[in-house]
Amino acid sequence: MRHLITAKDFNKVEIMELFKEASDFLDEKPRTFLKGKSITTIFFENSTRTLSSFESAARRLGARVLRLDVSRSSSSKGETLYDTAANLDAMSPNAIVVRHANSGVPLILAKHMHCPVVNGGDGKHAHPTQALLDLFTIYNHFQGDVEGKKICIVGDIKNSRVAASNIELLSRFNLDITLVAPPHFMPNTHLKKHYKLDENIIANSDIIMSLRTQTERHNKTVYASLKDYANDFCIQKSLVKDKKLILLHPGPVNRNIDISDEMMSDERTLVLKQVKNGVAIRMAVLKKLILENEG
């Protein structure tokens, strides 16, 4: 049984096959690959973009979508994770997409399911489809020439599952990664790191990936105000200038904290392209896992 718990679950050849399939899906035309199939989404954390993206992907492939309302589910009434898995499995879905605040939950569910489980984000651990869509966006922009491209990841890296998944995946494709964050947001790492964003760092980057400050994962107040954080880490036109690069963000963007209003409207900012690419990548992932499982 194949699952997608981390980006490591797909090798480089498989990822390139996903990219080829996703490129075809960018036309947004409905397909029937998963006609008659059922996909269950169960998100224990709030989500707009990721949940909507997965559900759009499933429907464009012809699948039915069952969204479980966690606030009203038995899990909110004390049901164990094992019982939740057993009940989900009894519904005989063809795939389950799960998001949870605790790292490891998708893997635990996968051990008890008879269908593919896709991790829609678990704690600080992983967000594999976000990393795949980010690399897909980079790959398309540079027409496949990504090896050696310099990417600067800026923000709350230590608490970000997006950063964790991207660092693993981008390293496999030999991108040159630099991390920029205040000391309390910087993980232990062998990668190049800086504690303040400046013009020189941006001038030496092909890609900037800005991250949201994960205030919900902080045990204590780090900044008196997010504006204090923005003074050192907000991506602004005055820093970027006319540098030829692309700017990414997994969303939601805290405007004028993560990225300035001016840069959000800049043609180098590909946030909306990431959203479009995300649906296509998730279509490719769902198709691959479900059809391989039943093949």
Swiss-Prot record:
Q: Which family does it belong to?
A: Belongs to the aspartate/ornithine carbamoyltransferase superfamily. ATCase family.
List, in alphabetical order, the Gene Ontology terms for molecular function in this entry: amino acid binding; aspartate carbamoyltransferase activity
Instruction: Summarize where L-aspartate binds, as residue positions.
Output: K77, R161, R212
**Which PROSITE patterns does this UniProt record tie to the protein?**
CARBAMOYLTRANSFERASE
Q: What is this protein called?
A: Aspartate carbamoyltransferase catalytic subunit
On subunit structure and binding partners, the annotation says: Heterododecamer (2C3:3R2) of six catalytic PyrB chains organized as two trimers (C3), and six regulatory PyrI chains organized as three dimers (R2).
The species is Campylobacter jejuni subsp. jejuni serotype O:23/36 (strain 81-176)
EC number(s) in its UniProt entry?
A: 2.1.3.2
- Function statement: Catalyzes the condensation of carbamoyl phosphate and aspartate to form carbamoyl aspartate and inorganic phosphate, the committed step in the de novo pyrimidine nucleotide biosynthesis pathway.
Binding of carbamoyl phosphate occurs at: R49, T50, R99, H127, Q130, G251, P252
Provide the reaction this enzyme catalyses: carbamoyl phosphate + L-aspartate = N-carbamoyl-L-aspartate + phosphate + H(+)
